[in-house]
Amino acid sequence: MVGKIIPASNWLRIKRLFKDVKISTQGSRMAAGHDIYAVEEGSIPAKGQAFVGTGIAIGLPKGICGRLAARSGMTSKNGIAVGGGVVNADYTGEVKVILGNHGKGEYQFKACDRIAQLIVEKI
């Protein structure tokens, strides 16, 4: 449901901004981060970058931040890196991910592909 706030952990709340957006998930109970998904398909040219929407907003309490980190498989297999990824507790807009393509060819992604992980940290 659009706009419904979903508790993802003790500190993290997630709000779906658009219909059919995939909400972040944890791969296991012991996973350090929550997988973050692309809201639409796109591509990144070789040696280029893209600002990719996720269709979610997050809520964090004071003293907590979210750090967007690369997914190891995307980096090792495709040369895709996540840039500048801190989400402050007072940010209320859509979470977007800067993806850089360090590979030799164009990188294509689809809606609902995992593009990063969000790690919730005390500051």
Place the predicted regions along the sequence by residue.
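DUTPase catalytic domain/fold
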Residues: 1-123
